[in-house]
Amino acid sequence: MIITDIYAQEVLDSRGNPTVRAFVALEDGTLAGATVPSGASTGKREALELRDGDERFCGKGVLKAVENVNTVIADEIVGMNVYEQKDIDNAMKKLDGTENYSNLGANAVLGVSMAVARAAAMSLGIPLYRYLGGANAQILPVPMFNIINGGAHANNSVDFQEFMVMPFGFDCFSDALRAVAEIYQNLKKILNELGYSTAVGDEGGFAPNLKDNEEPIKIIMQAIKKAGYEPGKQIKIALDVAASELYENGKYRLEGKTFTSEELIERYVKLCEKYPIFSIEDGLGEDDWEGWKKLTARLKDKIQLVGDDLFVTNEKILREGIEKGIANAILIKPNQIGSITQTMQTVRLAQRNGYRCIMSHRSGESEDSFIADFAVALNTGEIKTGATSRSERNAKYNRLLEIECENTEFLGNKI
């Protein structure tokens, strides 16, 4: 099926910043679009998000990226077969000519890459997850629900970026989603009773000013119990420390103090002994590989240790981490690497080497639910896409509810 047109426009994401929406048209009349997300806490080695840097939108306009789609990319890709995803992505990579898409912009390339996949699925009349994953795409992921926000995702006193709950003790996705929605509402009541703000952060979680980074966990434990669920058995806790944001001159600064890597690791060990923590993401900075070795040696057999800024969905960096025995899981963000093909290659490398994969949104999102299908397609087993609040977050959960009706299996207790 031949691609007859490719074009893009500048639209707004959930933070009110511009982003790229790309469209792909086919000879059978199919027209598909996709919107690119954007992160606030970003790894230094992520693919380049091309911004205009002029007066429009405080420098964050994306008209250059849009123009690249409408001209350079369209000239190269129009006329190609939409079902040749790898060839199309490789052609855009070659066209850009850099490792990090610094010429065309990863936001331009990814928008087209996503729209191509969606157009192909629509043309065939099959779900996106089935097109990308084939017959083996049948696992609904366990979500990480970010219900208290801190760090770069909220203007508050909390250093850790995300405090999440994971519903394990449920037979189906819809029951797991209901449980977390109830926990979220009970959390709101508890925060109100304690006199804390219930304003929400970028990802839909509450963003109160709390005294330290343990208090959110204590309050979440109360909310789990108040909602009628059992911590540790039905609901577990996950943290995203985003420690690169706290790293200064070889040490970590939080709660007005400085910590060495070893001291921060000991703090995590104590938290894991005290609370039912399943996962810690970016527990140390992306450049602190020696610290990561120590963290992995200490906790890899007890919890999930996720590299986000550490690996930036990059196959080469992940391979180095595997060789050095660093972390045991990877966060998967397509816009960190720039194309659907490259994302899939990274996931396959991780899975072959026993690393868990977590499909992830960004803090700047849209109503596009692509990653919900992508998580099922790649059998990642876990997905991270915010709280049960804000429609750009719920768009992904609602899409997973739709997929649940199509003979899929929820991992639940099986992780």
Curated annotation (Swiss-Prot):
Residues annotated as catalytic: 203, 333
Pathway recorded for this protein: Carbohydrate degradation; glycolysis; pyruvate from D-glyceraldehyde 3-phosphate: step 4/5
Record-linked Pfam families: Enolase_C, Enolase_N
Binding site for Mg(2+): 240, 281, 308
Subcellular location: Cytoplasm; Secreted; Cell surface
Protein's UniProt keywords contain Cell inner membrane: no
One example of a Gene Ontology biological process annotation: glycolytic process
Enzyme class: lyase
Keywords: Cytoplasm, Glycolysis, Lyase, Magnesium, Metal-binding, Secreted
Gene Ontology CC entries for this record: cell surface; extracellular region; phosphopyruvate hydratase complex
Main location: cytoplasm
Catalytic reactions on record: (2R)-2-phosphoglycerate = phosphoenolpyruvate + H2O
UniProt: (2R)-2-phosphoglycerate binding residues: 161, 333, 362-363, 384
Cofactor(s) of this protein: Mg(2+)
Family designation: Belongs to the enolase family.
Function: Catalyzes the reversible conversion of 2-phosphoglycerate (2-PG) into phosphoenolpyruvate (PEP). It is essential for the degradation of carbohydrates via glycolysis.
Name of the protein in its database record: Enolase
